[in-house]
């Protein structure tokens, strides 16, 4: 049994353990950020209290895309929220009778399971701005964290 746990060479086993710990420290210290959902704004895609991972390096080589679920920083270092990107830089976003309009055309949202009756006047996004909203549209618009944020507020892409 000892041979299975330690192997034939205890020194090599120790080196492997140290390397594995180093990989985990780098992964969870710099690349992957665990985030817990608090609330129902992302139902049914992400249930309340579910644990997810955010890839902080996801947007180093390409820009965020419409439909990506991202973690955004809204209120200081610990104020992270999970939201879906529906509007990209330069686009005009509006809500009319619960439907999202991008540049005047209805956005197909296969992930949306709960309809709403939201109305929001058109807003044109700047060159570095995105429009975020949760998947659970059954909540009143006033109770829903949503809206326009600059690219710098995106922490990373949600993996799980």
Predicted regions and their residues:
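Extended hydrophobic leader/signal-anchor segments used for secretion and membrane insertion
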Residues: 1-160
